[in-house]
């Protein structure tokens, strides 16, 4: 298992799907199994200070190979896969020298089509790794783990000058808890990069402000034949709440810097209903306004209800936009930008329409922009990645390490 592809295929064989609503971290045992495997691999590769925390966070050090002082930098990826689709029994397909057109995913009716995913037109001649149409792939973010691990091996075995490098592999990023038990002081890096982005060239230093909104609705059920003035239909109230939200401000109709309200689930009966939303916005003002709007709608719909019937709203902030924190350290993004340009990769700087561990870590003293992995269509059965994109991610990691050492020598 010495090359990039072998590593990636090994990592996706672990079922590490995280589970929302679980207090313990990691939320699933499968993540611990991968963490222990990564710990063993790091030790076998000869990295130092290899640790595995009680919460499943793996850390290790690649010592410097230069004599002059160099800032310690870090690279971080997460082990879990999204709850949105199964990560069990992942069966990757390797499509060499992609010639265009539809790709059959397994033996069913699922296909990966350039009609639905036009980015495929840009990937002719490349090696694609896809799903078999039954699960997600796990490129988010096991490709990041494979890329970091491969970069460390090549740096250790090669002649590229570099300072001390810390690596970390975290649990439960997909359920917003990846950085909750991350020991920034123990990690000991001056800055870091998550390797958790998408297509080649992506360089991200701003992300959504995010919150989850849970709405509990208690109604009153009686026989529908004698319900007038007595029945309170909890599902009807839920429908009214959703109808009062802006219909166009949903994920499927927004992009760029536009925020949204997303109804993730709704279940219930006449007697009781529950709704779960996520709320996203790039500006803090817009974020707070969205949360207030949801509270106001719930209050409006709940007016005049019988005292035994009510609407209860619970708001929980998940993470905030790291833009202002990263902006305090412009050299970090400049370094990544330069690394890409040196490798003839055009940096694509755009906001993350999501979050990363780096978003939370940036607020805990570890500024942490996000680098591409080379993957696409995360969180579903159409997820895929290119081997060429993964190799470019490895090269960027190595070039950042080299540039950091070079600039430190000049400054010294």
Curated annotation (Swiss-Prot):
What does the note under cofactor report? Binds 2 Zn(2+) ions per subunit.
Which residues are recorded as binding Zn(2+) 1? 78, 140, 196
Q: Where is the active site?
A: 80, 173 (proton acceptor)
Q: Where in the cell is it found?
A: Cytoplasm
Q: Which GO terms describe its biological process?
A: peptide catabolic process; proteolysis
Gene3D superfamilies this protein is in?
3.30.70.360, Zn peptidases
Pfam families the record matches: M20_dimer, Peptidase_M20
Instruction: Give the source's domain of life in one word.
Output: Bacteria
Which molecular-function annotations from GO does this UniProt entry contain? Answer: metallopeptidase activity; tripeptide aminopeptidase activity; zinc ion binding
- Protein's UniProt name: Peptidase T
Q: Which gene encodes it?
A: pepT
């Amino acid at each position: 298992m010495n090359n990039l592809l072998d590593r990636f295929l090994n990592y996706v064989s672990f079922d590490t799907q995280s589970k929302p609503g679980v207090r313990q971290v990691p939320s699933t045992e499968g993540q611990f199994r991968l963490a222990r495997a990564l710990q063993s691999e790091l030790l076998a590769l000869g990295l130092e200070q290899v640790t595995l925390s009680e919460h499943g966070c793996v850390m290790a050090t690649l010592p410097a190979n230069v004599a002059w002082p160099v800032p310690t930098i870090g690279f971080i990826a997460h082990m879990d896969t999204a709850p949105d689709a199964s990560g069990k029994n992942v069966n990757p397909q390797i499509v060499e020298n992609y010639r265009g057109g539809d790709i059959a995913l397994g033996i069913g009716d699922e296909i990966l089509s350039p009609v639905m995913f036009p980015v495929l037109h840009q990937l002719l001649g490349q090696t694609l790794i896809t799903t078999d149409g039954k699960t997600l792939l796990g490129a988010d973010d096991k490709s990041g783990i494979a890329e970091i691990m491969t970069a460390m091996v090549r740096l250790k075995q090669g002649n590229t000058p570099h300072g001390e490098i810390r690596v970390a592999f975290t649990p439960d990023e997909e359920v917003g808890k990846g950085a909750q038990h991350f020991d920034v002081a123990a990690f000991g890096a001056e800055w870091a990069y998550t390797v958790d982005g998408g297509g080649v060239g992506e360089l991200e230093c701003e992300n959504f402000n995010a919150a989850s909104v849970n709405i509990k609705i208690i109604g009153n059920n009686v026989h529908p034949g004698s319900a007038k003035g007595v029945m309170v239909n909890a599902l009807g109230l839920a429908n009214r709440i959703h109808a009062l939200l802006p219909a166009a401000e949903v994920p499927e109709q927004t992009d760029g810097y536009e925020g949204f309200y997303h109804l993730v689930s709704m279940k219930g009966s006449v007697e009781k209903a529950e709704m779960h939303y996520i709320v996203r916005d790039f500006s803090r003002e817009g974020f707070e306004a969205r949360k207030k709007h949801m509270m106001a709608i719930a209050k409006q719909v709940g007016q005049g209800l019988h005292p035994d019937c009510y609407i209860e709203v619970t708001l929980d902030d998940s993470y905030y936009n790291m833009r202002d924190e990263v902006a305090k350290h412009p050299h970090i993004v400049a370094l990544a930008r330069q690394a890409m340009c040196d490798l003839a990769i055009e940096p694509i700087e755009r906001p993350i329409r999501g979050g990363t561990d780096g978003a939370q870590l940036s607020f805990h003293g570890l500024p942490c922009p996000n680098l591409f992995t080379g993957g696409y269509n995360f969180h579903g059965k159409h997820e895929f990645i290119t081997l060429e994109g993964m190799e470019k991610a490895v090269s960027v990691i190595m070039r950042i390490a080299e540039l950091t050492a070079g600039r430190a020598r000049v400054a010294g």
